[in-house]
C-alpha cells in the first residue's frame, strides 16, 4: 500500500516535467569538463563543453572544493581564459592540492551537473608554445649550416626560476617524416648536414619538469642554397572554369637554385603547331594564368606547360591536357537566406532560398546547375545532406524546436564538372512550438491525469478483488438437473450417462438372427376356433400381460422350434454342393448350440406338463435369454404382428448350410418363444361365438391319437409365423411346432377345415380368419415328393440371395393350393 502511494506521488511530480518536455522545453543537458591546464605551476584554467540548453537560457557555474576542506567555492574568474572556462590565479592556486571541480547548468525548469573532475596543479602543467622562431643560413669554412632561434612562452615570468626544456623538429618540405632534436634549456640551435638547394620546415616546443610538452610552434620554411644551379621543375596543380566561358590554371614553383627565377606558362591547341603564352598572369593571382573568353575554345584540348628560368638555366613542368568542358567547377551559391514560416493551425517550417553564382549564365541556359544542401545542429558533428535539384528554394519541416542549425549549399553542372566549394555557414534558431498558454494546458491535463491514476490505483488496492470479480466474472457451472459436475471434471462419461438415464445398447443375441418374409398358419382337426361373445373387445376380466418385443420385430417367430425344425428338414434336401459352403463355420458352433438346445428341450417338456390340464387352449413356452423383457400376447394384436412383419423385411437373413437332416434338427437354435396364458383362450371363445368367425387358436389334443400329418405330442403349441400383404389384403400364416426328430407334412383330411383367408381385423388386436372351401386336399403320399422337388428348385434360385426373397407361387404348392407361403421351403436352418 505504501509503495503504491509513493509511486503515485512520483508520477504526479514528474508528469509536469514530462509535459514540458513534450512542449520542446526541458532542463539543460549535462555539461562536460574538457581539460584543466597550468602554464607555469602557479595558475591554471579549466574548460568545459556545454550540453543542450533545453530551449531556455542557461547559466553555467563552476564549483570546486579542496581535499582538505569541506567548503565549496565558485570559480573566481570566468573571462580571462575565454568562454566556457574558469581561470584560477595565484591566490586561488595551491600546489600539491587536489581540487574537486564540477560544472552546473541551470535554466528556468531545472539544473544538471557534470561529472566531478579531480585536479592536481602539479600534474596538469603544460606551458605555452615558444614564440619568435627564426631561421638563418650561415657559412663557416665553406660549410653551410642552419641557425635557429626562439623565445620562451609569453606567459613565462622572467623573474621566475622555472626552466623550460625545448625540442626542435625539422624535415624536407616534400617529405612527411620529421627529424626531432633535443635542445635542452637553450633557446637557439645549430643544425648541420643539410642538403644544399632543398627547402626545409622547422618547429619547436617546450616543457616544464614535471609536466607535459607544449604544442608545437608555427612552421617556419627556409631554402638551403646550393651555389649556382638551374631552378627545379615546377608542377601544375589544377585548371578550373567557373562558368564554362573562361578558365584558370595554377602551378607550384620548385627551388630557384639560389638565383631569381621567372615562370612562364606556354600552351598549344589540338590540331595546331603554334605555341602561345599565357594571356594574363595577374587576374587569378600569383603562380597562375587566366584565359579570358577570347582565348577559350570549347571542345578543344589544350596542351599546357610551365617553364622556370634563372641565370643558370631553365626547367619545364610535365604537360597538362585540358578540355574546358570537363574542368567546370562553379563558384558557391550566394545570397543564402533562411526564413521560418508559421502558418495557422500547422507546424512551423523553414524556407531556404539562394541565388546561383554571379559568373554562371543560367538564364540563357548556357550552364545548368544542380544544388545540394547540408545541415546539422550546432552541437552536432554529422551533417545531413539533401539533394535539391535545379530549384533555388527548399522547405524543411522536420526540424526540432529549440535547436540552432547550421546550413550550407553548393552546386555543380548537370552533366560534366565537379561540385563547387560549400557556401559560408548560415545559422538559424528554431523556436519552440508551444506557447505559455499551451504549456499551462498541458500541465493541467497532466495533473488531472495523475490524480485519476492515483484514484484508480488506490481503488485497485482497496477493492482489487471485487473489481476483478466484476470485470471478469467466474464462468458459471452447468445447470442441467441431474448432472454431477465432479463427473464432468473427472471425465467419467459412463457414470454421467447413467445419471441422466441414458442406457447403453442392448446386448446382441448369441445366435444368428433369422428374419422371415411371410407367416403361415396351419390348422388340424382337433384345433377348434374359440367363439367370442364380445363385439371386438376382450373381456374386462381378462388380464393382459404386455411383453416388450425385441427391436428386431419377429425374432419370436423366426426362432420358434417348429419353424427351425422344418427348416432343418428343408435344407437337407439341397444339393451336396450347397451343403458344404459354410460347413467349416457351422461346425465351430455345434458344441455351444447343443448345450443350449438341451436347456430348451427341458423347458419345453416342463411347459407341456403344465398345459396338459387345459382342454381349450395352449400357449408357447418362452426361453428367457439374458436381458429379456417380460412376456406378452404377441399374436392377440394383428397390428403388433403386422408391425413385426414390416420390421423384418428390412433385415438380412444369414443362410447356414448343414450336412445332414439329423444334425440340423438337433442343432437348430432358438432365440425367443412367445408364451400364452390359459385365461385368454376362454375370452377368445366368447369372441368367436359373437362374430361367427374363427381365430388363430389351437386346441390341445389330449389323447395319444396321431393325426395324419402331426404327432399328438407336438400339437401343444401354435404360433403366428408371418403377416404379409398380398393384393392390398392382409393374410396370416400360422405354423405348428414339432419336436420330433423328423419333419413330415400331411394334408388335412376332409373333415378338417383350413382357415386361409382373413376376414377382418377387429379392435383390440383381434385377427379374424375365414375358411376357404376351394382348398383341395392333397394326398399325404404326394407331399414329400413335391416338397423335395420344391426344395431343390428353390435351393438353385436362392444360392446367392441369402434366402431373403421367395416367389409367392412356390409357396402355394407347398401348402396344398392355399394362398399362403410356407417359409420352410426357402429359409435356412441354424446351427
Swiss-Prot record:
Example GO biological process: positive regulation of cell population proliferation
Localization of this protein: Membrane
GO annotations of cellular component type: external side of plasma membrane; plasma membrane; receptor complex
Motif (WSXWS motif): 419-423
MF (Gene Ontology): cytokine binding; metal ion binding; peptide hormone binding; prolactin receptor activity
Motif annotated as Box 1 motif, chain positions: 471-479
Region ranges (Disordered): 527-563, 774-796, 808-831
Segments of skewed composition (Polar residues): 787-796
Classification via Pfam families: EpoR_lig-bind, fn3
Primary localization class, coarse: membrane
Protein family: Belongs to the type I cytokine receptor family. Type 1 subfamily.
Official protein name in the record: Prolactin receptor
Organism in which the protein naturally occurs: Gallus gallus (Chicken)
Gene that encodes it: PRLR
